[in-house]
């Protein structure tokens, strides 16, 4: 879902 995509994006940037 959208929320999952956003969380994944934030996690990637935080990586």
Swiss-Prot record:
Modified residues (Leucine amide): 15
Domain of life according to the entry: Eukaryota
Predominant cellular place of this UniProt entry's protein: secreted
Entry keywords, A to Z: Amidation, Amphibian defense peptide, Antibiotic, Antimicrobial, Secreted
GO biological process: defense response to Gram-positive bacterium
Tissue: Expressed by the skin glands.
Subcellular location, record wording: Secreted
Any one annotated GO CC term: extracellular region
Keyword Secreted found: yes
Keyword Secreted belongs to the record: yes
UniProt function note: Has antibacterial activity against a wide spectrum of Gram-positive bacteria including B.cereus, E.faecalis, L.lactis, L.innocua, M.luteus, S.aureus, S.epidermidis and S.uberis. Lacks antibacterial activity against the Gram-negative bacteria E.cloacae and E.coli.
Protein name per UniProt: Signiferin-2.2
Organism name: Crinia signifera
Taxonomy of the source species: Eukaryota, Metazoa, Chordata, Craniata, Vertebrata
């Amino acid at each position: 879902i959208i929320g999952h995509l956003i969380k994944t994006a934030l996690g990637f940037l935080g990586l």
